[in-house]
Amino acid sequence: MRFENGLIFVGGRFVSGGFSVEDGRFAHVLADAADGESVDLRGARVIPGLVDVHTHGNSGADFSDGDYGGLVKMAAYLAKNGVTSFAPASMTLPYDVLETAFRTAVRLHRIAPKGCARLLGIQMEGPFFSEKKKGAQNAAYLRLPDYDAFARLYNAAEGLLRIADVAPELSGAVEFTRRASEKCTVSVAHTDASYEEAAAVFDAGATHLTHLYNAMPGIHHRRPGPIGAASERESVTAELICDGHHVHPSAVRMAFRLFPNRVCLISDALRCCGMPDGRYTLGGQDVFLSGGVARLSDGTIAGSAANLYDCMRNAAAFGVPVEQAVLAATAIPAREIGRAGETGSIADGLPADFVVCDDTLARHAVYLGGERL
């Protein structure tokens, strides 16, 4: 099948042309191809399927439940909404609960049900966090960095654990980072660290910052904190929740200037994503969704109720150049979980996961493996 007459997102920009789909993969991207059955895109934009490397749940299901049926439901919702690959994030919970969830992820990765987003990784969000900046994490299960516990979970995930989070100020964080970064990306998260403490962990091998601005100190001219330490290291990529509630539009634009080509848009979506207002749970705590905002009973903002596609569109609406917004939701997150050669781009040989959209990025159609959903 040939797709012609579109604006194809290749190499960080939109280029007039087309591509073929052969055996579920891209072929002849922006190149001439033999005549055959074709689709006229009529000038529509085509972007890669999105990659969400930090999503907890949707449709009433949560990754940490460890329920296979729920994970399938999550993956189907994501695919329908233009997110064709994902790495679900766990919560701060007992190790045996996390191990069950990770083994469930391995099962979905292997089976790869038709019509579902591809599970290509896991983000281990917790339990190595600061109590002061725990946010919506359950304080009862917070722990100091423990490489042996991490290794147990890494083995349970059979190579799928791609991001592990840690608060730099905790005892043992630097040594943990040195060892864990040999196996996966280490991210600074849920932290009250000083600039110096954060810098030590980045210099030990951390290359990621979980949900920039949230659950960490803000920038102060005498105390630049983890944001200052991260921004001046070109090896560090920063996640950003762009649901319109977690981060002000001005701070969204600032992030793209502080971290050029190093912003990774995420949803941080909870099980209430795609659901009506009401009461839900997160890591053993009640969460209340009202007007698109999810909060704990004490008013603390929890994760989001938005999917990544909506977050990408929000970024563009807030003034981020469209090309940068698309990169931040596709190629950059794919890179962060070590899957740049498998997803996140429109290139010969990669799975034909793509979204047909208009100039405002409004979806017209989603294709997974070259098949329209």
Give, region by region, the residue ranges found by the protein language model.
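C-terminal cap of metal-dependent C-N hydrolases
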Residues: 6, 335, 345-373
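Active-site gating loops and adjacent loop-to-helix segments of metal-dependent hydrolytic enzymes
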Residues: 76-87, 130-158, 200-212, 223, ...
